[in-house]
Every structure is written in structure tokens, then in C-alpha cells.
Amino acid sequence: MKKFLIVALSFICLICAGCFEVKFGLTITDSGAVIQHSKFIGTAALAPQIEAWKNQAEENNPNLQVKAVVEGDLRGYKFDVSYPDVETFSKYAGGFYAAHPEKNSGISRYASWFFDTYDFDLYFAGAPELTAFETTVNQALLSQAVFDVEINLPYAADSTNADEVSADGKYLKWHLAHVTINGGEKFMQARFKLWHKDKLAATAAVELLLLFATIFFAIKAHTEDFEAAKDFRFKRNVFAGLFVALTALAAFMIH
């Protein structure tokens, strides 16, 4: 996938007429699976280059899913690659998803019982410093270009520097066309959680059992004779203490 990304990014540097649209994106499911999306569409003048990129992408990744796309006068392809989890994706992803020395840390994971926290620290460098003439030419040729990076999350991001964020905080978008045209650097950052639903359910089940036990022994303590009631009160207090302790611990770990 890294070779594919490098080839794809060369698309931005072509000196050609016409407009085009390039989008890179990720969809991360609540189970942690990752679907990597790429879209390359352009005018008829770019058809040979787009077809060549498609062929090379398929050679580099046999699991690549390719779909033809037509949007008005623009034609091209969408590419999808699936990964079982974020860790696997981070191993194979290249380009701005990878770490670059002294620039960014790439993708980092911080594991805990109820959730894993992920830091996406991505980096993209535009063309080297350009002369005024080269900048003017690039702006003229690429004025209608769209080059975005998008991330779809199952839960709202904890923090991000995205240029666009949806109202629910789950959709993030960064615009790279300006950096591509004028040169410079773009740092893309997002922090988000992936919750362990099985562990949440297991913890909730244990808390319910402790609560039911507390209620059961509390009732028994009120209905039995004095001697038996002392034993039931002791058990009630033990289970109540465990329930409160586990609830407090869970609340602390979640926050």
C-alpha cells in the first residue's frame, strides 16, 4: 500500500490541464476494523494516468477493491482496502500515515481495560520551496483541484486539528490542496477511543450480581432472627462494599 500511496501522490505533481479530485480516507468501525479509501477522478485528459495508477495499485495489493466512478465530467476509480484492526493498518500504511523522523509519530495506541486510545499524528509535505513563477503556474493548473484526507470514526474524537469536523465529532477532514499548490507542510492530528464492549458488558454484569446480592442479603437481614440477621448484615455489607468499590473503579478508569 505504501508504493500505491507514493504513486498516487505523484498525481498532484503532474503538469497537465484540467481539474481532478483526490481523496484519501479511513473508516474505522466500533470493532476496530479499518477500511482505507482512496478516490482518483479527473477529466478525459487524465484518463491514461488514472488507468496506469489503477493497474499499479492492483499489482501492489491483490486485495484491493476497485470501483469505477463517474461524477459529472470527472471519471476515475475508488479503491478500498480492509484491515482487521488499527494495529495491522499502521504496519502496512505508508505515506502520511507513517512516522517521519523529527516530523510526526504516525499512529500510536494506548491500551486500557475499557477502551484503547489512538493518537493519529499524520504528516504531509507539499512541493519543495517554489519560485514565484512556479507557484503561479501551480495555482493556475491546480486551482480547481480537490485533495482531502478524511477519517470516519465510530465515536466522537477526543481532540483534533481537522479543518472540518461534523457536528457529532465523528467525521474529520483536512484540506491538502493549498499545501500541494504552494508548498509547505501539513500536520493532521486526531485522538479518539475505541471501546471494548465485551469488557464493559462483563463489568456491568458483575456489578449487577453484586447489587442483587446486596439487596438479597439486606432483605434476609430484616426477615431473619437476630443471630441469623447478623450474618446476613455482614454479607450485605461485604457485597455492598464490593459494589461501591467496583463502581468507583470503573468510573475512574472510564474518565
Specify the residue positions occupied by each region the protein language model found.
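Positively charged n-region of N-terminal signal peptides that target proteins for export
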Residues: 1-4
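C-terminal motif of bacterial Sec signal peptides marking the signal peptidase cleavage site
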Residues: 15-18
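One face of beta-strands
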Residues: 20-40, 120
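Solvent-exposed coil/turn segments that connect beta secondary-structure elements
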Residues: 31, 41-43, 84, 152-156, ...
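Structured domain cores in non-transmembrane regions
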Residues: 41-117
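Intrinsically disordered, low-complexity linkers and stems that provide flexible hinges
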Residues: 110-210, 214
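Juxtamembrane interface at the cytosolic side of transmembrane helices
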Residues: 212-239
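Juxtamembrane boundary at the C-terminal end of a transmembrane helix
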Residues: 249-255
